[in-house]
UniProtKB/Swiss-Prot annotation:
GO terms for biological process: rRNA processing. The keyword Zinc-finger does not apply. Its cofactor is Zn(2+). One of its GO terms (cellular component) is cytoplasm. This is Endoribonuclease YbeY.
């Protein structure tokens, strides 16, 4: 079971909470244990501040992942961590990349959840594994390959907004 805390700190239109839950559950289904996860949906000011504080990059990015570092057995439900998603960046990227907004949202939520599970894309081999899993999961939802186009930025690497 997934315990999802969806925190909305944006006035912009958003996918339904059921969509966020479906995307998270799909990404986390390899976990047999119950999980707790927070997704905070923010505007550019908060997104920029968090990215500056935690990654030392002075611009808002699409998704930030904060894996929990809680000793095992301390909580009834294992806390996976937090995702912070910058709503205007997601909207802008989807438009610039000619992607359906729901497909891009699904991709970024899945991408962030995989980071919370320990996946990364720093090394090429890790990136290939993570991207392959993202493609497979998104295909199950009926969405196209999010990496179909080498000129597109990876999640978490969005440069300063245009």
């Amino acid at each position: 079971m997934l315990e999802l805390d969806l925190q909305v700190a944006s006035v912009r239109p958003l996918p339904a909470e059921d969509d966020f839950r479906r995307w998270c559950e799909l990404a986390l289904r390899q976990r047999s244990a119950d999980s707790e996860l927070t997704i905070r949906l923010v505007d550019e000011e908060e997104g920029r501040e968090l990215n500056r504080t935690w990654r030392h990059k002075d611009y808002p990015t699409n998704v930030l992942s904060f894996p929990a570092e809680v000793p095992e057995g301390l909580l009834d439900i294992p806390l996976l961590g937090d995702l912070v998603i910058c709503v205007p960046v997601v909207e802008r990227e989807a438009a610039e990349q000619d992607k359906a907004a729901d497909a891009h949202w699904a991709h970024l939520v899945i991408h962030g959840c995989l980071h919370l599970l320990g996946y990364d894309h720093i090394e090429d081999a890790e990136a290939e594994e993570m991207e392959s899993l993202e493609r497979d999961l998104l295909a199950e939802l009926g969405y196209p390959d999010p990496y179909d186009g080498d000129d597109l930025p990876e999640p978490g690497t969005m440069s300063e907004g245009r």
